[in-house]
Every structure is written in structure tokens, then in C-alpha cells.
A protein has these predicted regions:
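Walker A/P-loop
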Residues: 1-6
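Post-Walker A helix-loop "phosphate-sensing" segment adjacent to the P-loop in P-loop NTPases
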Residues: 10-16
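Hydrophobic/aromatic-lined pockets within catalytic cores
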Residues: 12, 36, 161-162
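A substrate-engagement module of RecA-like helicase motors
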Residues: 16-18, 22-148
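Glycine-rich, N-terminal phosphate-binding loop of Rossmann-like dinucleotide-binding domains
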Residues: 22, 154, 178
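Conserved helix/coil segment N-terminal to the catalytic DExD/H
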Residues: 138-145, 155-170
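SF2 helicase catalytic motif II
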Residues: 169-178
Length: 178
């Protein structure tokens, strides 16, 4: 992980981001934890370091709204959706695979009413969605555009390298770890 200090210096000096590519979410978190030494202030770290994941890792607010609108006939399902809605309102990142998501919730309410509410089938309608400005996945994308260090998995990094983003925002510096 000795590459993190020079990468962060390069990003600051060049006002550009460095994408760090890893194989697993565990490695993503390990790198983010290591960066807490470079950026001990949590507020500064939140601006400079972003973990990017695919949309299938974030709660889709439209899917949650639709599930709540179809309120299931089973009281247990209604309680499950209530717990998800409560977590969503308190979550800063909506990451269903991250440390802030209570693992016991999946065991309690099942996959369909927890991680099943993510965008798993590519159904995201992006800016046409009423929740676009609050969307957890979009927040992650916007934060990555401003960050010095973006930590992502190999698949997402390769997609970014190939297609980039709006206004020619394709990253130009990459580090592949494992």
C-alpha cells in the first residue's frame, strides 16, 4: 500500500483523481482504512477519498418507494420495509454491502426486501427518476468526480477507463492492486 502517499500527492498537485482498482470489497475497505492515516480528519477524508461500487451495491430509492407502495399483505414484510426505510433515511451512503448496513437486517428480512431493492437488472432511469438528486449511486458518482483517490473494483475501473463519464471526465491515472 506504499503507493497511496505518492498517488495522493500527485492527485493534489495535478488537481486530478487517481483510481485505485482492487479485486474485492474487503480490499477496497482496507485501502480506505489505510488512507485514514494520510487523512486523519474525517471531513477532509470524505472529500478526498471515495469508494465507488456498482449500482447493485446501493439501495435504489425508487425500488424502495415502489415496494412501499405495494405494501405487502404480510405484516412481517411491512415491518421489514419499515426497517429498510428507516435505515435509508439515516444512511449517508445507502451502501447495502458496506459497514453502515446492519448485517442482521438481511437475516431478519431476507434478501428480497433488503439487497433485492438495489438496481440489479440495469433498470435505473438516471435523471428521469424523481430520486435522482438523492440517489445513493449518483451521490457516489458525483463524489468520485471531486475526489483525489477513488477506490473501486476492477470491473468498474475498466468500464470507467473505457467509457469515462460526462464532459470527458475519464480518469487518466490508475493503480491496480491485486
Amino acid at each position: 500500500l506504499g503507493y497511496l502517499a505518492p498517488a495522493s500527492l500527485w492527485a493534489e498537485m495535478n488537481d486530478a483523481s487517481v483510481w485505485v482498482s482492487t479485486y474485492t470489497r474487503t480490499l477496497q475497505q482496507q485501502i480506505a482504512d489505510e488512507l485514514s492515516r494520510l487523512y486523519p480528519d474525517a471531513t477532509e477524508r470524505a472529500k478526498k477519498v471515495v469508494i465507488r461500487k456498482g449500482r447493485e451495491n446501493y439501495l435504489c430509492l425508487l425500488n424502495l418507494e415502489e415496494a412501499l407502495g405495494r405494501m405487502p399483505g404480510q405484516p412481517a414484510d411491512a415491518v421489514a420495509l419499515g426497517l429498510m426505510a428507516r435505515w435509508a433515511s439515516a444512511s449517508s451512503d445507502g451502501d447495502l454491502t458496506g459497514a453502515s448496513f446492519p448485517a442482521w437486517l438481511v437475516d431478519l428480512i431476507g434478501t428480497r426486501l433488503s439487497v433485492g431493492l438495489a438496481d440489479r437488472r440495469g433498470e435505473c432511469i438516471h435523471s428521469a427518476c424523481l430520486h435522482y438528486h438523492k440517489c445513493f449511486g449518483e451521490k457516489s458518482i458525483r463524489a468520485a468526480r471531486q475526489a483525489d483517490i477513488v477506490i473501486a473494483n476492477h470491473a468498474l475501473v475498466m468500464i470507467q477507463a473505457a467509457i469515462g463519464g460526462p464532459e470527458g471526465s475519464r480518469p487518466t491515472r490508475y493503480i491496480f492492486d491485486e
